[in-house]
Amino acid sequence: MAKRKLTQNQTRRIQSNNAKTLHRHKKKEIEWSDEMLGESQEGVVVTRYSIHADVENEQGEIYRCNLRRTLSSLVVGDKVVWRKGNEQLQGVSGVIEAIHPRENEISRPDYYDGLKPIAANIDRIIIVSAVLPTLSLNIIDRYLVVCEIAGITPLIVLNKVDLLAQEQRQEIEDQLKIYQDIGYEILMISAKSGENMEKLTALLAQGTAIFVGQSGVGKSSLINHILPSVNAQVGDVSETSGLGQHTTTSSRLYHLPQGGNLIDSPGIREFGLWHLDAEQITKGYREFQYVLGTCKFRDCKHLSDPGCALREAVEQGKISPVRYDNYHRLIESLSETKSQRHFSLV
């Protein structure tokens, strides 16, 4: 998949930031020699910090580790090869030496550091929306583009439905039907009343999931409902590591009691699409695929172009005009300035 080309200034900034990071690593990193380490073993990254990561071994034990300088990137969910130290040094118990190939990853564009992976090896993205202040189908569509491009199954969750009167609920269900019609799964839930929380919990038991959505939609309430001991677990890990408590900006993978894993990633609150080109965004709309390539002109912009098969499908009721309009809003946003094109969900 082709990626948007960075400008010379962006490239220079990325190189400068990388150099500064390497310098910091040299100052803080422990030099692990071979005789200081045990045998290689498999593990999963459950938390990533600036120069450390917490790795869970096959027995469920968590160790804080350094990263080899040869590792280009490391995120929560990565499957790794690591070695435990014969003794703990400065609160660090071992070193990560290699990363297994990822099945998939979620990344967000960063103007200064390029495309930054957030999490890897995900089975399902839970797109959380809420009825208040307003339901934004445009934001849902942005997340769905990411899901389609990454090849990750989405679940659209509408939270706080307990705030809806029956008539309002019917209106919301009618709006969301455009997603059901093209094969997306939707769940109307309430963390407060417990409506459909059992169904959500059952779906989360199937693999590894990550929650995404705007601030205020109730992601934290959902996580606390599903995993009420989450804060206690964070505290326990900090005490065990001896390195003190990290801020809540760190992503973390949690094991759910009923099975499955949940990644809580505050970094997912900011989500831009400016690293994608128009062709990639078009491929992110699954219902467009059966008409693409059938337009009269190869360079069709799918607007007022004569013989546009996509526009004709909208006029015939085969494609939702709401989704079609949101698609063009996304395409138009690609040409916006830096301050405008960084899509913030905070």
UniProtKB/Swiss-Prot annotation:
Q: What class of enzyme is it?
A: hydrolase
Q: Which UniProt keywords apply?
A: Cytoplasm, GTP-binding, Hydrolase, Metal-binding, Nucleotide-binding, Ribosome biogenesis, RNA-binding, rRNA-binding, Zinc
Among Pfam families, the record links this protein to:
RsgA_GTPase
Q: How is the cofactor bound?
A: Binds 1 zinc ion per subunit.
Tell me the segments the record calls region Disordered: 1-25
Question: Which biological process terms from the Gene Ontology are attached to this UniProt entry?
Answer: ribosomal small subunit biogenesis
The record ties this protein, via CDD domains, to:
YjeQ_EngC
Q: Which SUPFAM superfamilies match?
A: P-loop containing nucleoside triphosphate hydrolases (SSF52540)
Q: What is its main location?
A: cytoplasm
Biased composition of type Polar residues is found at: 7-20
InterPro entries, per database record? G_CP_dom, NA-bd_OB-fold, P-loop_NTPase, Ribosome_biogen_GTPase_RsgA, RsgA_GTPase_dom
PROSITE patterns listed in its UniProt record:
ENGC_GTPASE, G_CP
Cofactors that this protein relies on: Zn(2+)
What family classification does the UniProt entry report for this protein? Belongs to the TRAFAC class YlqF/YawG GTPase family. RsgA subfamily.
Q: How does it assemble?
A: Monomer. Associates with 30S ribosomal subunit, binds 16S rRNA.
Looking up PANTHER family in the UniProt record yields: SMALL RIBOSOMAL SUBUNIT BIOGENESIS GTPASE RSGA (PTHR32120), SMALL RIBOSOMAL SUBUNIT BIOGENESIS GTPASE RSGA 1, MITOCHONDRIAL-RELATED (PTHR32120:SF11)
Protein name as annotated? Small ribosomal subunit biogenesis GTPase RsgA
| Organism phylogeny | Bacteria, Pseudomonadati, Pseudomonadota, Gammaproteobacteria, Pasteurellales
Gene behind the chain: rsgA
